[in-house]
Curated annotation (Swiss-Prot):
Dimerization mediated by the LisH domain may be required to activate dynein. Pfam families: LisH_PAC1, WD40. This is Nuclear distribution protein PAC1. The keyword Metal-binding does not apply. Positively regulates the activity of the minus-end directed microtubule motor protein dynein. Plays a central role in positioning the mitotic spindle at the bud neck during cell division. Targets cytoplasmic dynein to microtubule plus ends, thereby promoting dynein-mediated microtubule sliding along the bud cortex and consequently the movement of the mitotic spindle to the bud neck. WD repeats lie at residues 103-144, 146-184, 188-227, 230-269, 272-336, 339-378, 381-429. GO terms for cellular component: cytoplasmic microtubule; kinetochore; microtubule associated complex; nuclear envelope; spindle pole. Belongs to the WD repeat LIS1/nudF family. It comes from Cryptococcus neoformans var. neoformans serotype D (strain JEC21 / ATCC MYA-565) (Filobasidiella neoformans). PROSITE patterns: LISH (PS50896), WD_REPEATS_1 (PS00678), WD_REPEATS_2 (PS50082), WD_REPEATS_REGION (PS50294).
Amino acid sequence: MAALSDRQKDELHRAMLAYLHAAGMHNAYAALQHDAALADVDPRDRAVGLLEKKWTSVIRLQKKVIDLENRNAALLAELAAAARPAAPGPFLPRPPPRHTLASHRAPVTRLAFHPTWTLLASASEDATVKLWDWEAGDMERTLKGHTKAVMDVDFDPRGGLMATCSSDLTLKLWDTANQYTNVKTLHGHDHSVSSVRFMPDGETLVSASRDKTIRVWQVSSGYCIKTFSGHAEWVREAVPSEDGRWLVSASNDQTSRIWDFSTGETKMELRGHEHVVECAVFAPVNAYPAIRELAGLKPPAPRDTRAKSPGVYAATGSRDKTIKLWDALSGQCLRTLVGHDNWIRALVFHPSGKYLLSASDDKTIKVWDLANGRCTKTIEAHSHFVTSMTWGRAVGASGGIEKVNGDASSKEPRRINVLATGSVDQTIKVWTP
């Protein structure tokens, strides 16, 4: 009671006395009245009912305090959640690039990442191939040997050999472990060679040419062992499926073809574009669910081996400014993606299987959500036409080297988040998180 003033004590006693009187507690009333030397309760006294009011106020205040404490706890939880780093989503390129690599004296035509080293190879119309440390942003060497524009470059699955092709009608093999010595020059095409790819076994090469053919080469001997014919015009590109069973090609005849690699037969002709088909690529198996959702297809039966087989779906890009997604087995066009303002030059499926990236002569990269076909992101990538685009490779869970595009492994490989683009502006840009 020491904390109360005399006036407060008097008001408290009178309030208690009024409460005891109203409650009929006569003995307690008489004792308090005697001890506190108070007169009888006056019904008009403002102390009448005061104790009940105070008690009710305390209960209301306690409830308010509890509500405020709960609200404060919720706000603190929200604050803590906001302060925690967000779970990393799929890597998508965003400006600015990590490096802009400049040394070529003519447009960059194609790019390839080494499967194990932090090395990027760039092919150019200046007739050279340049090798870059993409992490440091430094140029390591320039390779000369072709006499005309170098149109494409690729590394074998283990990185021991590099292949190039050129408008000089030849392909060349370079030994990466021996100062990039040119160990073989392959002759056979009758016109510019526009595309070269190692098959997954690393023992064969496939090339596409303006002579309207696709050729298969034995790496060990350098001999042409197969020639695929069928296109009516320049074959721009020929790309194998992840298991090497199929090839998809793009041509000036406005078609794309699916080839059986073992027989050289055309299994399907994809018609629908209204101009030159510049690029074609198979979808990786992990993109199949999103593509089926986009096309409104039912999930496959559990025993349907097609659901996990490489080469089921493909994408093509054309000078008609569109991208088409295809069922490669039936030849049906599942969806046409529209958004670019100029030729489509390169297509890459995102390693997550959720997106498709496209590069165009409108100087941009576009990111397409495969599940709904919408463009979710546009990146102003270069000051001139974007001619090429490629992902870094991936190290498999078993330690083997697997390419990011077309991964059909049941064990998720360790992804390397790096994308490179090349341009008519003579630069290469490296995009990392």
